[in-house]
């Protein structure tokens, strides 16, 4: 069943989704617009997911951010960026979603309910002030 969906499970509980186009005989297809700009992809991802983290696998702050959300009970969508992709995060887009929060700089950057919360420091501040859980409940990422 997993193979039919393009999923592979590895020994360390990692699941990989194969995004190669399906064969012509398949009745389902994955629509990927290769013409879509990086900015448009980012906008789409932000609008489709209640909690999304733009992360780097080599960043310890990204790991702490993911662990904090997991501890609360939220499974965020995580987009791992390579070093060359980090520069593709447009600052104008960050300004549009930030609500006045300065998020200029490298990831991690977390978006909750289409609003840029910022980096790890901002996320921890929300948590310590007691505002994070209600915000996650409001966007449907957490049920209490």
From Swiss-Prot:
SUPFAM superfamilies with a match to the protein in the record: Thioredoxin-like
Locations listed in the record: Cytoplasm
Disulphide bond pairs: 59-62
Chief location: cytoplasm
Domain Glutaredoxin: 39-143
GO cellular component: cytoplasm
Keyword list, A-Z: Cytoplasm, Disulfide bond, Electron transport, Redox-active center, Transport
Taxonomic superkingdom: Eukaryota
Cytoplasm among keywords: yes
The family this protein is said to belong to: Belongs to the glutaredoxin family. CC-type subfamily.
Entry function: Has a glutathione-disulfide oxidoreductase activity in the presence of NADPH and glutathione reductase. Reduces low molecular weight disulfides and proteins.
Official protein name in the record: Glutaredoxin-C6
Native organism: Arabidopsis thaliana
Gene designation per UniProt: GRXC6
